Amino acid sequence: MKSSSKIMYGLTVFLAAMAVIYIFGTMYVDDRGSVMGLEWVGATALVLSTALTLMLGVYIHITERRTDVLPEDWEEAEVADKAGTLGFFSPGSIWPAAMSGAVGLLGFGIIFMHYWLILVGALALTYTIAKLNFQYGVPREKH
């Protein structure tokens, strides 16, 4: 078993213990010390979080058995072993900031339920995504 699945299994055990403590704590104790019913939102969240970390741990465990030794699990690995090939990055591009503004505009439209603002935000987001992807030009046709 490798480190990633061990972390998920440990988190599963922790969340299961916290779910049991939380369920019994909210079932029997109130802020005033009187008997109270189960608090369903927190109990459901903890139980589902436990199930999610267990599913993720099992998936990682099965996946790691099929792969070779990862750099994280190899004691003599260097930092460069994990890095891989980095893609092109344009530090002077304005479009990531413009795209963030468009997402903010869309978010405000959704929050305040102004349909015109949702439309403007969606159009601005579509425009900025296109400009980000095509900022270095579209190659000319070869014919």
UniProtKB/Swiss-Prot annotation:
Record has Electron transport as a keyword: no
Alphabetized UniProt keyword annotations: Cell membrane, Membrane, Translocase, Transmembrane, Transmembrane helix
Pfam name, any one: Cyt_c_ox_IV
Membrane-protein topology: Multi-pass membrane protein
Record localization: Cell membrane
GO molecular function, a single term: cytochrome-c oxidase activity
Protein name as annotated: Cytochrome c oxidase polypeptide 4
Organism: Corynebacterium efficiens (strain DSM 44549 / YS-314 / AJ 12310 / JCM 11189 / NBRC 100395)
Name of the gene: ctaF
